[in-house]
Curated annotation (Swiss-Prot):
Subcellular location: Plastid, Chloroplast thylakoid membrane
Keywords: ATP synthesis, CF(0), Chloroplast, Hydrogen ion transport, Ion transport, Lipid-binding, Membrane, Plastid, Thylakoid, Transmembrane, Transmembrane helix, Transport
Name under which the protein is recorded: ATP synthase subunit c, chloroplastic
Gene3D superfamilies for the chain: F1F0 ATP synthase subunit C
GO molecular function annotation: lipid binding; proton-transporting ATP synthase activity, rotational mechanism
Site (Reversibly protonated during proton transport): E61
Family that this chain belongs to: Belongs to the ATPase C chain family.
Any Pfam family matching the protein: ATP-synt_C
Length: 82
């Protein structure tokens, strides 16, 4: 086992989780802010806005989970590290 490959796998796993969390984090903050603004403008549409927001947040969170899966694969199922 090459120590360089093992170190690169750990660095890549950290980058995978970190970079996969940036986009959805920004998107979730923006979506929540827009939803609060929409509810403030139209309180009667609160239920519809909230349902759409929760569905959107679930899809955004899936992207972060994909990054976590890639990181776990790099750490524990890496074919280059024996």
């Amino acid at each position: 086992m090459s120590p360089l490959i093992a170190a690169a796998s750990v660095v890549a796993a950290g980058l995978a989780v970190g970079l996969a969390s940036i986009g959805p984090g920004i998107g979730q903050g923006t979506a929540a802010g827009q939803a609060v603004g929409g509810i403030a403008r139209q309180p009667e549409a609160e239920g519809k806005i909230r349902g759409t927001l929760l569905l959107s947040l679930a899809f955004m969170e899936a992207l972060t989970i994909y990054g976590l899966v890639v990181a776990l694969a790099l750490l524990f199922a890496n074919p280059f590290v024996s």
